[in-house]
Amino acid sequence: VYPGGKSVNVTRVLKSLGIPVHLIGIAGRENIDLLRGLLDRDGIDYRLLETAGAVRENITVITPDRRAFTVNRQGIPIEKQAWDQLFISVQKELVPDGENLVVFAGSLPPNISAAEYKRLILSIRRPNVKIALDTDFFSFSQIREIAPFVIKPNMKEAENILSRSGITARDAFGAASLLAEA
């Protein structure tokens, strides 16, 4: 058993590279202590805000021929108090006189709209804050408005962003060029 998800994985990689990193997240209080224990075991610096429900648990099965099958369960709704506290927590972590890189990664909670998530991101936009996105729920126009420093879509995520299927690498590069011009 190990903690995962895009945000935890980004945190783990940055830590392995010797980059100071602090994870802020919202987790279900029913089994939050298990997650805290796993993060502590891995030496991850974190702040978890609590909401009703349980931390999502995903299952990966590796077959004898080394194929992997993953069952990703849906995330839990976020209580308004926890969502509001997230705004405050992210603001507090910013280094006022230094450079900041804030990574927003993972799926959209079922009761939070992309517009509301965008509002969180825009609330921290400053000259010394760089935004990185690894999500699949923003539209092309929303991404242009956010103007991230970096975005990391895979092909499926790029299809969501461009609102069409069957895109090519050329399509993705063309869209990236348009985003870079914004």
Task: Give residue spans per PLM region.
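Substrate-binding N-lobe of the ribokinase-like
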Residues: 1-56
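Cofactor-binding loop segments of dinucleotide-utilizing enzymes, especially the Rossmann-like FAD-
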Residues: 25-29, 51, 64, 73, ...
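Short beta-strands and strand-loop turn motifs
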Residues: 70-72, 99-107, 134, 152-157
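Short acidic/histidine-rich motifs immediately flanking catalytic phosphotransfer sites
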Residues: 96-101, 147
